[in-house]
A protein has these predicted regions:
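Glycine- and acidic
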Residues: 32-39, 64-70, 194-198, 208-209, ...
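Long, charge-rich, low-complexity alpha-helical segments
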Residues: 202-257
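C-terminal accessory regions of radical SAM enzymes
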Residues: 77-204
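Generic amphipathic alpha-helical segments used as scaffolds and interaction surfaces in large
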Residues: 8, 73, 152-155, 198, ...
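Short alpha-helix boundary/capping motifs
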Residues: 44-46, 84, 253-254
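An acidic, carboxylate-rich microenvironment
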Residues: 48, 78-81, 224, 241
Length: 257
């Protein structure tokens, strides 16, 4: 069956959905930009969106989602950060599309457009075709509206986001299916990475492997990673040992925080 859910589900909750027969979920991910998620009042962080995708795929649940743009206050930096991040997510299910924000009646954007830098310009494009009488005020009956914002985004960044999302979809329909998997031995972890068109094998040992394993199941703070190291070595870890391992994994695109 199909259900709509929030994207802040835990691994255990997603496993329960799978065991209960859920085949498709729509978690309303819509962005990997923290500022855009805050603007939407989603109550989630980009990392929670990533984890929802990860565990849904792990438990065999299809996930339907889209990337939304066109929010008031969005910046070029928001687009650049999101583009850079989604290039690291090619092993996860791609979005159905990149679409623009839909402005609806009764929403905060409709009720207080000036507060958000929005100017409502017309009713939705379909209304004049459906209600063609000249006596009907489409602005009074419409539920969705055309609008512009004071935000100016670099058109090349928009195009790059569209192209990156399209490449993501094409990769999942090709013979070169992207993947990111790992195997765990006693003293090391081997990561097999084909998110790009190049296959890469990365061997992680010591602190790098410990940090990788520590963060695999759920998000961890630096303090929690240090505690994990302490259990491994039986004493307080050296200064910056955890931080250096985290930095290495982030550089390789294996850790996000």
């Amino acid at each position: 069956f199909f259900i709509e859910v929030k994207s802040n589900l835990t691994k255990k909750q997603i496993k329960t959905l799978a065991q209960g027969g859920a085949k498709v979920i729509q978690p309303g991910i819509e962005s990997f930009s923290m500022s855009q998620l805050q603007e939407m009042d989603k109550g989630v962080r980009p990392l929670q969106n990533i984890l929802c995708m990860k565990w849904a795929m792990y438990y065999g649940i299809e996930i339907n989602w889209n990337i939304l743009i066109g929010f008031p206050g969005e910046t070029n930096d928001d687009f650049r950060q999101q583009i850079n991040l989604i290039k690291l997510l090619f092993h996860l299910p791609p979005p159905e599309c990149v679409g623009s924000l839909w402005l609806e009646r009764f929403s905060p954007y409709f009720q207080r457009p000036e507060e958000y830098g929005i100017k409502i310009t017309a009713p939705g494009e379909a209304y004049p075709f459906v209600y063609d009488s000249p006596n009907i005020d489409h602005l009074k009956i419409a539920y969705d509206f055309e609008f512009v914002t004071t935000t100016q985004i670099d058109p090349q960044l928009k195009q790059e986001l569209f192209q990156t999302a399209e490449e993501w979809k094409e990769r999942h329909q090709s013979e070169q299916l992207p993947y990111l998997i790992f195997t765990k031995a006693m003293d090391f972890v081997t990561v097999y990475d084909q998110r790009s068109l190049e296959s890469i094998k990365i061997r992680l040992e010591g602190p790098q492997a410990w940090a990788f394993i520590c963060c695999n199941e759920a998000p961890k703070s630096v303090g929690q990673i240090r505690d994990f190291f302490r259990e491994k070595i039986g004493k307080d870890p050296e200064d910056n040992l955890a931080e250096n391992a985290i930095a290495y994994l982030e550089e390789k695109g294996l850790l996000y925080g």
